C-alpha cells in the first residue's frame, strides 16, 4: 500500500487516495499449539515472504510495540514465495509462518495440522494508540480526472461500496462469481472472504487510519513512502 504514497511524491502530488479497500490480511500460522500471545513469539523462527514490503514492516512494528526486538528476540527468515513458507512450517514444527489471505485458507485446507495462531491485524490495532489500522490496499485516482469528473468519481465510489457490501453480506454468491472467473476456487473464496478484510472506508476515518499507518512506516524507513509523509491533499473527501 505504501507504494501509493511513493506514487504521490513521484507524480508531484497528482494523485489522491479515495478510500481504503483492504485492511490487514496477514496472519501468523503454526504447525502446533505453542503460540497463544505475541509474547510467545520470543525465541521463535518466523518464516515470511515479502522482505522490504508490508509484511516485514508490519511484523516489525507489532513486535517492537510489544517489547520484542525483531533482530534479537526472534529469527525472521524470508522466503521468495508463500508456498515456501508453508513447506518450512511443515518441516519445522517449532516455527511460525507469516502468511496473507487467501493463501492462509488454502494452506489450512491442504494441511489440517496447520492453524492460525495470531491475527497480525488485531495485534496492530491492539498495539497502536494512534487510531491507525494495518492497511493493505487503497483506491487512488488522478487529481485532474477527479476535478473534471467529480460526479462520475462519486458514482464510482458509491458503486464500489455497494460491491463491498455485497461481497461481505453474501459470501456464497460472491465466491461463486470469483470461482466462475477462475480467480480462485469457490470453496477457498467462501472460506477466505470473512478474513480478507474487504472494506470501503473514506473521509476522516480513512485519513486517521491511513495517516497513522504511514507514520509508522515512516518511523522505520522514510524511503519506502517516498521520503516524507503526505499532506492533507493526499486524502480525498467528498
Where in this protein do the model-derived segments appear?
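Short, glycine-/small- and polar/acidic-enriched structural segments
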Residues: 3-68, 78, 95, 101, ...
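Secondary-structure end/capping motifs
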Residues: 146-220
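Short, surface-exposed acidic
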Residues: 70-74, 182-194, 225-231
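Pocket-lining segment of extracytoplasmic ligand-binding domains
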Residues: 3, 77, 81-177
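Sec/Tat-exported extracytoplasmic proteins
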Residues: 8-11, 42-45, 50, 63-67, ...
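Conserved C-terminal helix/tail region of periplasmic/extracytoplasmic solute-binding proteins
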Residues: 211-238
